[in-house]
């Protein structure tokens, strides 16, 4: 099992770890209208799925803003940001920060994303939140890029991700 750190704590990641080449599972998440939606989207060249612990964190907000900016530049790519925040909180934060060009989804109801993508934080002060991670899926829903950020306080490798999307 993979591990990540936050300050002095080390977390075991729970759930089924996906590898590059695996078919990505389609899971139910909750949107800003409290409606259940499927993660996987049809008819897009690439799908970037970005998970983070909480949009209230400064690094998490930077990550969401970065992907919002990229979403405006790459119309053939679908961007989703997923956290365990309640959809109401997600909406308030994104509205205040001008984040509007990507899908903001919550895994709070079923934890299905965290468990099926292997990014649910295990025992510790952040238990039950999502590890900072990025998955890129191709048009068939196959994982072609995966990054789990080892230190939760750091941002993903945006340059490596953008190379995959070119």
From Swiss-Prot:
Domain Thioredoxin: 18-166
Active site: 60
A Pfam family matched in the record: Redoxin
UniProt keyword list: Antioxidant, Disulfide bond, Oxidoreductase, Peroxidase, Redox-active center
Membrane-spanning residues: none
Coiled-coil annotated residue ranges, if any: none
Top class in the EC scheme: oxidoreductase
InterPro entries documented for this protein: Redoxin (IPR013740), Thioredoxin-like_sf (IPR036249), Thioredoxin_domain (IPR013766), TPX (IPR002065), Tpx_CS (IPR018219), Tpx_Peroxidase_subfamily (IPR050455)
Enzymatic reactions: a hydroperoxide + [thioredoxin]-dithiol = an alcohol + [thioredoxin]-disulfide + H2O
GO molecular function: thioredoxin peroxidase activity
EC code(s) of this entry: 1.11.1.24
Keyword flag Disulfide bond: yes
Disulfide cross-links: 60-94
Subunit and partners: Homodimer.
Family assignment from sequence similarity: Belongs to the peroxiredoxin family. Tpx subfamily.
Annotated function: Thiol-specific peroxidase that catalyzes the reduction of hydrogen peroxide and organic hydroperoxides to water and alcohols, respectively. Plays a role in cell protection against oxidative stress by detoxifying peroxides.
HAMAP family (UniProt xref): Tpx
Other remarks on this protein: The active site is a conserved redox-active cysteine residue, the peroxidatic cysteine (C(P)), which makes the nucleophilic attack on the peroxide substrate. The peroxide oxidizes the C(P)-SH to cysteine sulfenic acid (C(P)-SOH), which then reacts with another cysteine residue, the resolving cysteine (C(R)), to form a disulfide bridge. The disulfide is subsequently reduced by an appropriate electron donor to complete the catalytic cycle. In this atypical 2-Cys peroxiredoxin, C(R) is present in the same subunit to form an intramolecular disulfide.
Name of this protein: Thiol peroxidase
Organism: Helicobacter pylori (strain J99 / ATCC 700824)
Lineage, broadest ranks: Bacteria, Pseudomonadati, Campylobacterota, Epsilonproteobacteria, Campylobacterales
């Amino acid at each position: 099992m993979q591990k990540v750190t936050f300050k002095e704590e080390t977390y075991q990641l729970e759930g089924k770890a996906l590898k590059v080449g695996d078919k990505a599972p389609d899971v139910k998440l909750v949107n800003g209208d409290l409606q259940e939606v499927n993660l996987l989207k049809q008819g897009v060249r690439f799908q970037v799925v970005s998970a983070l612990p909480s949009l209230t964190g400064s690094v998490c907000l930077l990550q969401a803003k970065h992907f919002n900016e990229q979403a405006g530049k790459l119309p053939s790519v679908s961007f989703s940001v997923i956290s365990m925040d309640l959809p109401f909180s997600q909406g308030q934060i994104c509205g205040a920060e001008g984040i509007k060009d990507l899908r903001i989804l919550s895994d709070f109801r079923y934890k299905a994303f965290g468990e099926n993508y292997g990014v649910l934080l295990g025992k510790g002060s952040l238990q039950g939140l999502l590890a900072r991670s990025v998955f890129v899926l191709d048009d068939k829903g196959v994982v072609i890029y995966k990054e789990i950020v080892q230190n939760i306080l750091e941002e993903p490798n945006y340059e490596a991700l953008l190379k995959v999307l070119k």
